[in-house]
From Swiss-Prot:
The gene is SEPTIN2. This is Septin-2. Belongs to the TRAFAC class TrmE-Era-EngA-EngB-Septin-like GTPase superfamily. Septin GTPase family. The modification Phosphotyrosine is found at Y17, Y211. Coordinated expression with SEPTIN6 and SEPTIN7. Filament-forming cytoskeletal GTPase. Forms a filamentous structure with SEPTIN12, SEPTIN6, SEPTIN2 and probably SEPTIN4 at the sperm annulus which is required for the structural integrity and motility of the sperm tail during postmeiotic differentiation. Required for normal organization of the actin cytoskeleton. Plays a role in the biogenesis of polarized columnar-shaped epithelium by maintaining polyglutamylated microtubules, thus facilitating efficient vesicle transport, and by impeding MAP4 binding to tubulin. Required for the progression through mitosis.
Length: 361
């Protein structure tokens, strides 16, 4: 008697259906189970509202115990690296978010060396990932590479400062830079547009590479294409952050209350906060891919080239040492051979003298 075939493996309604179409669902389930990792760096002068904006973006308090330094402490203050990691879960999707803050940037009178600490940190994360990737246990690598850098630009100037230009050029081949105009509520709409245009012109003039959003695919829906167009047109993003809930038009909103009215953080007519958050969420995967395929690969290639030359030099040094030792051994062997020959000649001469003396006796 033949066994009955399990009905769950029979699909009579769609003959010829193999099931490859289910692969994206498998990838999705695996990704959701594993969770996602993202590292965001924020850089800018003190007082531009970096911490407030980050707390507003992710609806959390990443800096509950921060102490604001006084003016005297800022004069000789050096750049520090403060990494805060939080686990965020939304509808079953887990995100391990690391925010790297850089307090002290631009505060000291002499900012000549303020880049070094930040650049060293970025390179150290690349180096750590390269080391882990080259190890035996590669299944559980924690990705601490910096995937995006929000660079905060002061709204009180007339464009980029020399410090802004120098810093962005120092890191633009290492990380995705997203320029952000801080405290946009200090500017009128016309002032904001003029400042944006001036910053973009200076970025192009100095050949600074910022993160460019990829074009929408031709098969994307029109709403997504329009969203992408609006996001691109908003760079650099002019933003307002606030941790306070205030009442506006009968509802509680995050915002700032002024004598002349209310600035709502999440109102796209007031600032680009929602656009910045939308860009970060919808392009998080692309930011990671650009980090992996461009910035990390550049670092890895340069690192392996330097490592190759280093090994080559070490091998040359070893060969040179071996040659020198072989030459030294040959010299010692020749010296010993000469000494043996001299001793043999002396012994032969001594035997002759002894014989004649005996003969005379």
């Amino acid at each position: 008697m033949s066994k009955q075939q399990p009905t769950q493996f029979i699909n009579p309604e769609t003959p010829g259906y193999v099931g490859f179409a289910n692969l994206p669902n498998q990838v999705h389930r695996k990704s959701v189970k594993k969770g996602f990792e993202f590292t965001l760096m924020v850089v800018g002068e003190s007082g531009l509202g970096k911490s407030t904006l980050i707390n507003s973006l992710f609806l959390t308090d990443l800096y509950p115990e921060r102490v604001i330094p006084g003016a005297a402490e800022k004069i000789e203050r050096t750049v520090q690296i403060e990494a805060s990691t939080v686990e965020i879960e939304e509808r079953g999707v887990k995100l391990r978010l690391t925010v790297v803050d850089t307090p002290g940037y631009g505060d000291a009178i002499n900012c000549r060396d303020c880049f070094k600490t930040i650049i060293s940190y970025i390179d150290e994360q690349f180096e750590r990932y390269l080391h882990d990737e080259s190890g035996l246990n590669r299944r559980h690598i924690i990705d601490n590479r910096v995937h995006c850098c929000f660079y905060f630009i002061s709204p009180f100037g007339h464009g980029l400062k020399p410090l802004d230009v120098a810093f962005m050029k120092a890191i633009h081949n290492k990380v995705n830079i997203v320029p952000v105009i801080a405290k946009a509520d200090t500017l009128t709409l016309k002032e904001r547009e003029r400042l944006k245009k001036r910053i973009l012109d200076e970025i192009e003039e100095h050949n600074i590479k910022i993160y460019h959003l990829p074009d929408a695919e031709s098969d994307e829906d029109e709403d997504f294409k329009e969203q992408t167009r609006l996001l691109k047109a908003s760079i650099p993003f002019s933003v307002v952050g606030s941790n306070q809930l205030i009442e506006a038009k009968g509802k509680k909103v995050r915002g700032r209350l002024y004598p002349w009215g209310v600035v709502e953080v999440e109102n796209p007519e007031h600032n680009d906060f929602l656009k910045l958050r939308t860009m970060l969420i919808t392009h998080m995967q692309d930011l990671q891919e650009v980090t992996q395929d461009l910035h990390y690969e550049n670092f890895r290639s340069e690192r392996l080239k330097r490592g190759g030359r280093k090994v080559e030099n070490e091998d040359m040094n070893k060969d040179q040492i071996l040659l020198e030792k072989e030459a030294e051994l040959r010299r010692m062997q020749e010296m010993i051979a000469r000494m043996q020959a001299q001793m043999q000649m002396q012994m032969q001469g001594g035997d002759g003298d002894g014989g004649s003396l005996g003969h005379h006796v």
